[in-house]
C-alpha cells in the first residue's frame, strides 16, 4: 500500500526533473552552421565547446563567476623569460622580493614576510598589489585551429550569396486583397486602416506588390 506522501506526489502537476529530462535539455541541436554542427561535442557545455573551437561564448569580459588563476612566482618568472620582449612589467625574482617594501612592486598573489631578527616570528606581511598581465583567452591553445579557418572561408563564401526573401502565404493573401481593392493606387492603399494596419508606406506597398505580381505572373 502506497504512502500518503507518494499519492500526493502522483497527483501533483509538478513533474519530477529526472535525469532523462536533463539529458534532453542538454542535447542542443546546432543547425545554424554546418561546420560548428560537425565539430560540436554534446558531452560539453556551450562555453566549453566554444572555447575548444577557438570561439567566444560572450564578446564582453566576464562579469564574475570565474575563479581567477593566481600564478606562483616560478610560473611568473618562466612567463617573463618566455615573453621577455613583449612583457610590459618587470616581474621581480625571489631575492628581489625579499628586499622590497613597496606593495606595488610585488606581484599580486605574492607577499613578503618581515621577521623579528631575534625571535624569527613574522611581525609584518606586505601583500603584493602589482597587476601582472593576464593571459588573454585568444592566446590559449585551440584544440582544433582548422575550424577557425573553415568558418572564415564559409563566412566569406556565403557573404557573396544574396538570399532572396520569399513572401509568405499570409503576406500573399494580404497583398492580393489590397491589389483587388485598389489596383495600382498605392496612395489609397496607404490610408486604408483596416487592410494596412501596420501603416506601410506607399513605396513599401509598391515594392511588395511588384514582387507579388512577378511571382504570380501578373
Curated annotation (Swiss-Prot):
Its main location: nucleus. Residues 64-84 have a biased composition (Basic and acidic residues). It comes from the Eukaryota. GO terms for cellular component: nucleolus; preribosome, large subunit precursor. Keywords: Nucleus, Ribonucleoprotein, Ribosome biogenesis, rRNA processing. Residues 1-29, 58-92 are annotated as: Disordered. The keyword DNA damage does not apply. Residues 1-23 have a biased composition (Basic residues). It is found in: Nucleus, Nucleolus. One of its GO terms (biological process) is rRNA processing. Component of the pre-66S ribosomal particle. Belongs to the NOP16 family. Involved in the biogenesis of the 60S ribosomal subunit. This is Nucleolar protein 16. The gene is NOP16.
